[in-house]
């Protein structure tokens, strides 16, 4: 089912789980998640669960998309955000409706090609894509006010810290095991502040682009 009622049920569940940013919840409500999964899984698109998208990757559960987006925007609007891990393009689409410009990096070209098509179908034109290694980020267009990483890094990549603007926020799952820690890192005048927030489960952030 992809009816409005199933979407409303999802939003109510996210609200009950403690998510409260009205703008983020409204974007989740109106973004057609069923377009970002294979047709065979479309009936499960509005369940609060991660779903496979091929290439050993998943579309993140809506709670985690909303949670990470809330953390990114908690200090106010952002005009320039880098996303590491385009994946299905769902998180990208959510960001594109909340920030001025999104720069999205994906190592698996086939996934990114599909994501481009989906965002074009939704007429989201403020996203620029790069096929490449997420560990490296996109230094040519740095700095960024916000960086969001949708796969778990074994450690925080120094290259991403270097590409964060003063006052910028990095939301990233960190850890090499089955369960990782969601971290919020903010660039301050004299370095970086780091907060460990939630225990999470993400696919690993891998090196090297794949055609």
From Swiss-Prot:
An example GO CC term for this entry is:
cytoplasm
Spell out the reaction equation it catalyses: [protein]-L-isoaspartate + S-adenosyl-L-methionine = [protein]-L-isoaspartate alpha-methyl ester + S-adenosyl-L-homocysteine
Query: What's a GO biological-process term for it?
Result: methylation
Q: Which residues form the signal peptide?
A: none
UniProt keyword Transferase present: yes
What's the domain of life for this entry?
A: Bacteria
Supply the PANTHER family for this chain.
PROTEIN-L-ISOASPARTATE O-METHYLTRANSFERASE, PROTEIN-L-ISOASPARTATE(D-ASPARTATE) O-METHYLTRANSFERASE
What exactly does this protein do?
Catalyzes the methyl esterification of L-isoaspartyl residues in peptides and proteins that result from spontaneous decomposition of normal L-aspartyl and L-asparaginyl residues. It plays a role in the repair and/or degradation of damaged proteins.
> Which family is this sequence assigned to?
Belongs to the methyltransferase superfamily. L-isoaspartyl/D-aspartyl protein methyltransferase family.
Q: What is this protein called?
A: Protein-L-isoaspartate O-methyltransferase
Gene symbol here is pcm
């Amino acid at each position: 089912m992809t009816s409005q009622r199933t979407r409303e049920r999802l939003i109510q569940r996210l609200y009950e789980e403690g998510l409260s940013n009205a703008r983020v919840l409204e974007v989740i409500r109106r973004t057609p998640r069923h377009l970002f999964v294979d047709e065979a899984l479309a009936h499960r698109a509005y369940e609060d669960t991660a779903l496979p998208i091929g290439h050993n990757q998943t579309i993140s559960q809506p709670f985690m998309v909303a949670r990470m987006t809330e953390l990114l925007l908690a200090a106010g609007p952002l005009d320039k955000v880098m996303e590491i891990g385009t994946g299905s393009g769902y998180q990208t689409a959510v960001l594109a409706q909340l920030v001025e410009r999104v720069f999205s990096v994906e190592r698996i070209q086939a996934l990114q090609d599909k994501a481009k098509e989906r965002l074009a179908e939704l007429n989201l034109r403020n996203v620029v894509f790069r096929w490449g290694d997420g560990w490296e980020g996109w230094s040519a267009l740095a700095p960024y006010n916000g960086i969001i990483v949708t796969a778990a890094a074994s450690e925080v990549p120094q290259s991403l810290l270097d590409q964060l603007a003063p006052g910028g926020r990095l939301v990233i799952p960190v850890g090499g095991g089955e369960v990782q820690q969601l971290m919020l890192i903010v660039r301050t005048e004299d370095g970086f502040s780091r907060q460990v927030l939630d225990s999470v489960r993400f696919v690993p952030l891998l090196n090297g682009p794949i055609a």
